[in-house]
Design a protein with these regions (language model features):
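Short helix- or helix-capping micro-motifs
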Residues: 11-16, 23, 72, 76
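Transmembrane-embedded, aromatic-rich helix segments that form part
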Residues: 81-106
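Membrane-interface transmembrane helices that cradle and orient dolichyl/undecaprenyl
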Residues: 2, 6, 41-64, 94-101
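Transmembrane helical bundles and short interhelical boundary loops of multi-pass, membrane-embedded
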Residues: 64-67, 97-108, 112-147, 151, ...
Length: 354
């Protein structure tokens, strides 16, 4: 994605030292699996965008599409948030496909109008017009397989252990009924919860979710587990995401496809929650975090290319991220800490950490 090891490392570094990543994966919640698959499906769609539709052998463009669809299926089979990501994936694919279609239409027009074309441009137009129809058709057919048939097979296959039971009420009809039951359940979860939070609070890291507190600690000591974001990662990431949106609107996304990739990826995983009426929690933001991290890396990459003082700023930012990770580590893992230490971590009145 970045083609530069230091910036690839920076993205990995920020994900490693984010609080939410630690808390959710350490507790073994299901969220870590779909988040991984969402990252991979978007990555391989980006790889597909960089393939040359007209100059590479057609079959070489297919593995990226196949892997994107494969991980999309695994993501949806893990948790329904994978469906949100799939919408963003579809937007990216049809944007790529639309660009190639425009190239084909433009090439046909240039050849039909018999403009004075250079030999090189005429050869390009003839190459495009000769290859597009067949390749476009085969791409669509492959996408039906990669993004419909295979994901559906994976989703149904995730019920294999249920379906293999030789007993009544263990068929595909019951699998379908379970989907309806899950949908109706989530549609009707309106009871309040002491640690619920709204979608607009998540990027600002306003409300944590408190998982555990020990009631057997000696006086002056606390053992507690919470999930929230690393303020340095989340607050900086929000600013960098806004920067990406502005850059995309200004047209920079035409030159650097990664900007739109990040913006669409974030929007697909975050905006559906705006419309969800049920009770929600900060961990629902987990799938959006990789995209604010990538927005941060894009910002620092741009800064590094333009400013000589960018390197110490980036290093200082990384030191801050690690320092906060170390400071908050006990309240993310349940390691005993003094009450005084715990009191230092309550940066916002809405945070309940112990």
């Amino acid at each position: 994605l970045f083609r530069k090891t230091p910036f690839a490392f920076l993205g990995t570094f920020l994900m490693t030292f984010d609080f939410m990543h630690l808390a959710q994966t350490r507790l073994g919640t299901i969220d870590s699996y779909p988040v991984l698959f969402i990252i991979l499906e978007f990555y391989f769609m980006m790889r597909y965008a960089y393939h040359s539709f007209y100059h590479e052998k057609f079959w070489k463009t297919l593995p990226s599409l196949f892997l994107s669809g494969l991980f999309m299926g695994l993501g949806m089979a893990s948790k329904w948030i994978g469906i949100y990501a799939a919408v963003g994936l579809a937007v990216l694919f049809f944007t790529i496909f639309g660009t190639r279609t425009k190239e084909y239409i433009a090439a046909r027009r240039e050849l039909a109008e018999e403009k004075t074309l250079s030999a090189e441009r005429r050869a390009q137009c003839e190459n495009i017009t000769s290859k597009y129809p067949k390749r476009a058709l085969w791409t669509i057919l492959c996408c039906v397989l990669f993004f419909v048939v295979i994901p559906l097979g994976i989703y149904i296959g995730s019920y294999y252990q249920f379906l293999r039971i030789d007993a009544p009420h263990h068929g595909l009809k019951e699998v379908w009924n379970y989907q309806l039951h899950m949908f109706n359940y989530h549609k009707g979860v309106f009871e309040s919860h002491p640690f619920e939070s709204s979608w607009w609070q998540w990027p600002l890291d306003i409300r944590n979710i408190w998982y555990y507190v020990s009631d057997s600690m000696p006086q002056g000591w606390v053992s507690s587990i919470s999930a929230l974001g690393n303020p340095a990662v989340w607050w900086t990431g929000l600013g960098c995401l806004i920067w990406c949106v502005v850059r995309a609107v200004q047209g920079y996304g035409k030159r650097d496809k990664r900007i739109w990739w990040v913006v669409i990826g974030f929007a697909a995983n975050f905006l559906p929650w705006v419309l969800v009426p049920r009770v929600t929690f900060v961990y629902h933001y987990f799938a959006s975090v990789p995209f604010i991290i990538l927005a941060t890396v894009l910002f620092f990459e741009d800064l590094y290319d333009k400013k000589t003082w960018a390197k110490p700023v980036i290093i200082g930012f990384m030191v801050l991220v690690v320092a906060l990770y170390a400071l908050f580590y006990p309240v993310l893992t349940g390691i005993p800490m003094t009450s005084f230490h715990a009191s230092l971590l309550k940066w916002l009145p809405s945070w309940t950490l112990y």
